[in-house]
């Protein structure tokens, strides 16, 4: 019917209406659970035959089905969902010229990406269940099939449990030392040695670790070709042990060079940390607009309800930003509100009736249709260099236009690297901004921390006196160990029967995790922890800490800032049931402070030799994830 029209303009409009009708009629959600693209294609063609009575309309409908299914087959040739998504987006740009068709094509890409992520997660969960079943089968095989040395170690532990609580610690240490001598040490500082309990085969069961969040814990909130926004799993939803974080969420944003992030406001207070790149932030406070250039290490707060937008003003480098949110409407839940958009995001203005909008904006329906819902490219879009220059220039005519650096009295950004390192030596550097340093952090009572640990070195052990921290790996790999008194109850009681509170046994579970880029761990207040740079490069960490005011890091080793060294010798002698000389030799042998040579370095060189230590690469050289 379209081909019989006289003018090309009428023909294009007719074809566009056919396409629109076709896409709107097909309920793609019915096919989302299909594994085989050919099955999807056949169902699509069957739908065409059922709904279209005209043979030519059936032919057109089936041709569109075939095109879509061919795209699906090409899509499935790639194993990685991210690569599939990127190829799909490129195909949309190459084949589609009409904005409507482009949007439909991109929506198909989004559906396929989410479907593949669900399949990937399902495969992971099935593998986890299979591993757990195999582990349980091994445990049911009985003592006779277990390693004699492991059986001896477990017998030793059971013997310790029958002793008085004050003697159990030393007894358990003797068991561990005995097992180490047999080459199956429970020393978690050396993953290759193996371990006991649920870590018995040398690799920790990180799925049992409520404090560890791998990259699968990140869900994609928005994604376009120009970047993506991901949010970490709800802390309190993971475990009740993380109840202190039930009102907080962690968000990671990545934007390509010359990208523009649409204006929005949140029903949550937000603290932004620039991990890499150079950006610009615009915030609207009532009728005033404030603008700030952002650099690596900048920290700034965006109050709830403040409309803001971001620009990557660099031509070559991606912009990486971490956002720490404190929710205010629903604990642990937050929402974005976009005034402009299309279908994803949908503009909140479009939810009002046209009569209301016409009256509020003093305009006509035609103007509303010409503006609202026209932006089809998503939350993060590409801007021309001319548009970037216009958005980031210092416009003297703009109201309340501020280009300034932050400080104690400023609402502008505070740069972590403008102050001296909190701790620094050849093995690492650490920077931190606390509420007492930057007034914008006081209401939320949050601190922001960045550390650079050289390859093979370690930080700690130490504990935070008041603050619980969410620590994320920006680059490198980390072996993390933490002492936790809360997890020991998971493995059952030891003495049987109900005890009085004063007779309760004190036991700490050794919690460990291996973290890679974009993975996180929660360190609760008071929990001793250590971070080891275990990869082939320096380890770069950033962290957000709650309950930050008057928090201090108490270190348990080192020449300086070591709280154990401040305990009187007589008290140490009594506490450790060892001679004063032995205690002093143990706690006074380390010449460094805060950052130390790691376990492997310590084994390769004498404790006092540092000539072979690699030079420290400054954290200022770090440019992103």
From Swiss-Prot:
SMART domains: Cupin_1 (SM00835). The keyword Secreted applies. GO terms for molecular function: IgE binding; nutrient reservoir activity. GO terms for cellular component: extraorganismal space. One of its GO terms (biological process) is killing of cells of another organism. Residues 198-212 have a biased composition (Basic and acidic residues). It is found in: Secreted. Residues 120-152, 180-212, 594-614 are annotated as: Disordered. InterPro entries: Cupin_1, RmlC-like_jellyroll, RmlC_Cupin_sf, Seed_Storage-Functional, Vicilin_N. The keyword Secreted applies. Keywords: Allergen, Antibiotic, Antimicrobial, Fungicide, IgE-binding protein, Plant defense, Secreted, Seed storage protein, Storage protein. Residues 601-614 have a biased composition (Low complexity). Residues 230-369, 414-584 form the Cupin type-1 domain. Antimicrobial peptides 2b, 2c and 2d have antibacterial and antifungal activity against a range of species. PANTHER family: CUPINCIN (PTHR31189:SF13), OS03G0336100 PROTEIN-RELATED (PTHR31189). Belongs to the 7S seed storage protein family. This is Vicilin-like antimicrobial peptides 2-3. It comes from Macadamia integrifolia (Macadamia nut). The lineage of its organism: Eukaryota, Viridiplantae, Streptophyta, Embryophyta, Tracheophyta.
């Amino acid at each position: 019917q379209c081909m019989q029209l006289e003018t090309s303009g009428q023909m294009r409009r007719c074809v566009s209406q056919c396409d629109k009708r076709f896409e709107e009629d097909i309920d793609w959600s019915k096919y989302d659970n299909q594994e085989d693209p050919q099955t999807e294609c056949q169902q699509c063609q069957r739908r065409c035959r059922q709904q279209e009575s005209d043979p030519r309309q059936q032919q057109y409908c089936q041709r569109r089905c075939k095109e879509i299914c061919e795209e699906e087959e090409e899509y499935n040739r790639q194993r990685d969902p991210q690569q599939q998504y990127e190829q799909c987006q490129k195909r949309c740009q190459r084949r589609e010229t009409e904005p409507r068709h482009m949007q439909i094509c991109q929506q198909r890409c989004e559906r396929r990406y989410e479907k593949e992520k669900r399949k990937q997660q399902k495969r992971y969960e099935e593998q986890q269940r299979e591993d757990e079943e195999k582990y349980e089968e091994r445990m049911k095989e009985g003592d006779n099939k277990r390693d004699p040395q492991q059986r001896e170690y477990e017998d030793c532990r059971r013997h310790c449990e029958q002793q008085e609580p004050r003697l159990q610690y030393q007894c358990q240490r003797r068991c561990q030392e005995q097992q180490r001598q047999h080459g199956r040490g429970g020393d978690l500082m050396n993953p290759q040695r193996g371990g006991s309990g649920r870590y018995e085969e040398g690799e920790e069961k990180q799925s049992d670790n409520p404090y560890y969040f791998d990259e699968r814990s990140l869900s994609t909130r928005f994604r376009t070709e120009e970047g993506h926004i991901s949010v970490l799993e709800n802390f309190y939803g993971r475990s009740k042990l993380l109840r202190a974080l039930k009102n907080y969420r962690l968000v990671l944003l990545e934007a390509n060079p010359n990208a523009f992030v649409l204006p929005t406001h949140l029903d949550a207070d937000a603290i932004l940390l620039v991990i890499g790149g150079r950006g610009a932030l615009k915030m609207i406070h009532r009728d005033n607009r404030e603008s700030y250039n952002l650099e690596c290490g900048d920290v700034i707060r965006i109050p709830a309800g403040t409309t803001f937008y971001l620009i990557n003003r660099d031509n070559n480098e991606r912009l990486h930003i971490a956002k720490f949110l404190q929710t205010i409407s629903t604990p642990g839940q937050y929402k974005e509100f976009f005034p402009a958009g299309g279908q994803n995001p949908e503009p909140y203005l479009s939810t009002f009736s046209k009569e209301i909008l016409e009256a509020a904006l003093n305009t006509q329906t035609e103007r509303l249709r010409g503006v609202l819902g026209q932006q089809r490219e998503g939350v993060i879009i590409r801007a021309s260099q001319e548009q970037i220059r216009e958005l980031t220039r210092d416009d003297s005519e703009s109201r309340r236009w501020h280009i300034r650096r932050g400080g104690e009295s400023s609402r502008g950004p505070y740069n972590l690297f403008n102050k001296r390192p909190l701790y620094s030596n050849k093995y690492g550097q650490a920077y931190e901004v606390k509420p007492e340093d930057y007034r914008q952090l006081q209401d939320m009572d949050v601190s922001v921390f960045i550390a650079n640990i050289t390859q093979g070195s370690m930080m700690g052990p130490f504990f935070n006196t008041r603050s619980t921290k969410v620590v994320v790996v920006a680059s490198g790999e980390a072996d993390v160990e933490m002492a936790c008194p809360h997890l020991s109850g998971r493995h059952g009681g030891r003495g049987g029967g109900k005890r009085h509170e004063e007779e309760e046994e004190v036991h700490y579970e050794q919690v460990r995790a291996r973290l890679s880029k974009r993975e996180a761990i929660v360190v609760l207040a008071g929990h001793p922890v250590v971070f080891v740079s275990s990869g082939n490069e320096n380890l770069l960490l950033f962290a957000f800490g709650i309950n930050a005011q008057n928090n201090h890091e108490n270190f348990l080793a080192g020449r300086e800032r070591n709280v154990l060294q401040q305990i009187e010798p007589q008290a140490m002698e009594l506490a450790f049931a060892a001679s004063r000389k032995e205690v002093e030799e143990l706690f006074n042998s380390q010449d460094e402070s805060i950052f130390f040579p790691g376990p492997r370095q310590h084994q390769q060189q004498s404790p006092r030799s540092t000539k072979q230590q690699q030079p420290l690469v400054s954290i200022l050289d770090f440019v992103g994830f």
